[in-house]
Regions:
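N-terminal cap/lid subdomain of alpha/beta-hydrolase-fold enzymes
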Residues: 49-118
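Conserved alpha/beta-hydrolase "acid-adjacent" motif
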Residues: 298-306
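Catalytic active-site module of serine/aspartate enzymes centered on a nucleophile-bearing elbow/loop
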Residues: 314-353
Length: 353
């Protein structure tokens, strides 16, 4: 039976892709972008992918645009992976790409958008989450001509950006879905782990102030911290129940992460959260908002009790905590629509214009 299901998926997923509008990729260049630090870039490139076509109502307002934002070290391409893609964008799914206009940007410093590894290295402007959200807004409004969003959602860092969209542009969207995030300053263990990642690179003599010829060993040390930052104890025990399997599991992840990351980019990506703090602005968020976290998320552990209290300040907010099951994946549960799709469906229903 399992083999049959596997074969069905192998043939069904490509067939489903043929039934959907082809993804479109592009770049939008913002001229003379001024960062929160006061630094400027003559040309800031933002890469993006779109699925579907925009549709307007009788007043000319867009009614089907959806913005989905990725996590730290990621890109918009991560939402084209099978579990997310077919779970949300496929025919008959909640965000069917034949019905919605889906926008998947690469944030500043990520993917194919402007980033330190393009050549500026540590001379790249010290961007923040505020800069990233402002640039996303410029892409959406000026680059793509979108004047309203049906839904703003994001995973991890993208979830944090979703909170920011809610108070920076409160009338711009119908609904908000932050996944795997908290609406408070990054402190405690979370900030300590980020500092460990940054220090592991910058304290390595091979980093050379960012002017290395090959990736410094400090990147590998940083990757160890990244891996355990997003770990899932239950699932990892199931996947690696012996010493040999555990070591092979770790070695594989270290190799994949180090081959995908750049040391300077990683420093910027994790430090961009340094002044993130939506807490003073939560009452400004007026669109219906469902904040979804999972009980096995080591980045946003529910025992802190933060969302239990802060969600009370969001006028139309609701906190959903997914219980630990055999299907949750710790912090990575944010990318499994099968776990939280029922709540997205409810959010879309109650926020219908």
């Amino acid at each position: 039976m399992r083999r049959l299901l596997t074969l069905l998926c192998v043939f069904w997923f490509p067939a489903m892709l043929l039934a959907l509008p082809a993804p479109k990729e592009g770049d939008y260049v913002i001229r003379d972008f001024q960062f929160e630090s006061g630094e400027t870039m003559p040309e800031l490139r933002l890469h993006y992918t779109t699925l579907g076509l925009p549709r307007t109502d009788k007043s000319g307002a867009l009614k089907n645009a959806v913005l989905i934002m990725h996590g730290t070290t990621g890109s918009g391409q991560q939402f084209r992976r099978e579990a997310f893609f077919k779970g949300l964008f496929g025919p008959g799914q909640l965000l069917d790409a034949r019905e919605y206009y889906i926008i998947l940007p690469d944030g500043i410093g990520h993917g194919q958008s402007s980033k330190p590894s393009d050549g500026l290295h540590m001379r790249f402007p010290k961007y923040t989450y505020t800069d990233m959200v402002r640039a996303q807004h410029a892409l959406v409004t000026e680059g793509l001509g979108v004047n309203h969003l049906r839904l703003v959602m994001g995973t991890s860092m993208g979830g944090m950006h979703t909170w920011m969209w809610g108070y920076l542009y409160p009338n711009f969207m119908d609904a908000l879905l932050p996944l795997a995030s908290l609406p408070v300053e990054i402190a405690g263990r979370n900030r300590m782990q980020r500092k460990m990642i940054i220090d592991a690179i910058m304290n390595d003599p091979g980093w050379k102030g960012g002017e290395y010829e090959e990736q410094p060993y400090g990147l590998t040390a940083a990757v160890y911290a990244v891996i355990f930052m997003v770990s899932s104890p239950l699932q990892w025990q199931k996947e690696a129940p012996t010493r040999e399997q555990a070591e092979a599991f770790l070695d594989d992840r270290v190799q994949r992460y180090t081959s995908a990351f750049d040391a300077n980019d990683l420093i910027y990506q994790f430090d961009a959260s340094r002044n993130y703090d939506p807490q003073p602005h939560l009452e400004k968020i007026i669109a219906p908002l469902f904040a979804i976290n999972s009980a096995d998320d080591q980045v946003n552990p529910p025992e802190l009790g933060i969302l239990d209290e802060e969600i009370k300040r969001v006028p139309n907010g609701r906190y959903v905590l997914l219980p630990i099951t055999g299907e949750t994946r710790g912090h990575g549960s944010h990318s499994l629509p099968a776990l939280w799709g029922v709540y997205l469906e409810e959010l879309l229903e109650i926020s219908e214009p």
